[in-house]
Amino acid sequence: MAKKSMIARDVKRKKMAERYAAKRSALMAAFNSAADPMSRLEIHRKIQALPRNSAPTRIRNRCWATGKPRGVYRDFGLCRNQLRERAHKGELPGVVKSSW
């Protein structure tokens, strides 16, 4: 189980990324379309003025059951240990143990 403070920090980052997503994407579009170096510099400063935690790259992919940050399967949102346990119990619909 991950520390609750780390899970809370990640939740805070997700909310902040949602809040600033439209503004960040508009600034990025303007930055990519600007031809003048001075206007690009000005737009870049505006992007840098946004909060760091509003960047989607700072969001960590975590297991929703345990909060573990590593070994998380995107399709299920579970870490490998929880995926194995729940698959054996039959709690994941459509997951079948392979045999060949």
From Swiss-Prot:
GO molecular function, one term: rRNA binding
Gene3D superfamilies, alphabetized: 1.10.287.1480
Tagged with keyword Transmembrane: no
SUPFAM superfamilies: Glucocorticoid receptor-like (DNA-binding domain) (SSF57716)
Keyword field: Ribonucleoprotein, Ribosomal protein, RNA-binding, rRNA-binding
Any single GO BP term: translation
Superkingdom of source: Bacteria
GO CC term (a single one): small ribosomal subunit
Pfam families in UniProt: Ribosomal_S14 (PF00253)
Family: Belongs to the universal ribosomal protein uS14 family.
Function summary: Binds 16S rRNA, required for the assembly of 30S particles and may also be responsible for determining the conformation of the 16S rRNA at the A site.
Complex and partners: Part of the 30S ribosomal subunit. Contacts proteins S3 and S10.
Protein name stated in the entry: Small ribosomal subunit protein uS14
Annotated source species: Synechococcus sp. (strain CC9902)
Gene that specifies this protein: rpsN
